[in-house]
Amino acid sequence: DEILSNWDDLKRKEKKQETDTSTLESVSKSLPSLIRAQKLQKKAAKVGFDWPDVSGALDKVEEELAEVRAAMGGDGDVEEEIGDLIFAVTNVSRFVKVDSERAAEKTCNKFVRRFADMEQQAKAQGRQLSELTLEEMDALWDEAKKKEHRE
C-alpha cells in the first residue's frame, strides 16, 4: 500500500508540474529559429494572443523596424531589436501561410546565384568584384536579377 501511495503522489506531482509549465515550453528549443518562431506564434494564436488580421502584424514589423533604427542610434540593444524584427516578419509569414524557414533558404540560394553571376560578369570584364565600386557592383547585381527574370 505504501508503494502504491508513493506512486500516486509521484504521479500527482508530475501532473501538477505539467500544468505549471507554459503552453509554449512544448515547442522544442532545438528547432531552427524561424520554424520555432512560427510554432510559438501559432500556439499563442490558438489561445487568442494574435492580431485579428495581417495588417496588425505588418504594423508590428514597422514598429520593430523603427526600434532597430533607434537602437542603432544608441537607444537600445541592436541584437535584441533585430531579433524582434525577425520575429515580427516571421509572424507576417505565418499569416500569409508562407514557411519562413523555406522562404529564407530560397532567398539565400537566390543571393548565392546572383552573386556568382556578378563574379562571372566581372571576370568577363577582366576584373574582380573587389576592384569594383559599389555602384558598379549594383549594376552587375541588377543585370543578374534581370537575367533571372528572363529565364
Question: Model-predicted segments: where are they?
Answer:
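Flexible "arm" and connector segments at domain edges
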Residues: 1-82, 86-151
